Curated annotation (Swiss-Prot):
Signal sequence coordinates: none
Function: Cell division inhibitor that blocks the formation of polar Z ring septums. Rapidly oscillates between the poles of the cell to destabilize FtsZ filaments that have formed before they mature into polar Z rings. Prevents FtsZ polymerization.
NCBIfam families: minC (TIGR01222)
Species for this entry: Sulfurihydrogenibium sp. (strain YO3AOP1)
Keyword presence, Transmembrane helix: no
SUPFAM superfamilies in alphabetical order: Cell-division inhibitor MinC, C-terminal domain (SSF63848)
Annotated protein name in UniProt: Probable septum site-determining protein MinC
Amino acid sequence: MGVEIKGLTVPALLIKLDPSKSLQENIDELKQKLSSAFFKGSYAVVDYNGLELNEESKVEIEKVLKDFNASVLGFQNTKNNKESLKGVTQKKSLKIINKTLRSGQKVEYDGDVLILGDVNPDAYVVSSGSVIVMGNLRGVVHAGANGDETAVVMALKLRPQQIRISNYIARSPDEPDVKAEESNSPEIAYIENNAIVIDKIK
């Protein structure tokens, strides 16, 4: 079968490892496929698909992607998902929403949330971890809902009605920043000095 790389939504990729091969064989094949300029500068979700991975193995995969200027958004295990979520040593699970959230829709999850689409006005996302939106964030997001002040909110375009991280709240300005609206740089919101700060990701 081999390593599969599929486009989830631009610029996110789903990298599905081959459990019938060793970790090193998967990494070698991944390097070969990532050599295409098409994948450089992408974000990726790695599905280890039943392959046994420890934290060192995940770091090794992240390093390979980093060498090709790609970033890992998270890991998932579709082949054994139920056991994965029950694992006591699991740091934080990742919920992937492969659609746009429309007005009135709400997602709540104990872990990190990756949305492969937009979050429209009056849509809500509540997460105990970080929230990553591979699209426009124009709704309401609460990251670190259980008090995690290290959580972040990332989006390709960050224009929320409200962002909340842990117990800190920020709202979009009444007058939009024209230069910011025209910018194509992804943005990240995080807590610094007891306030939510928004920066561009360069």
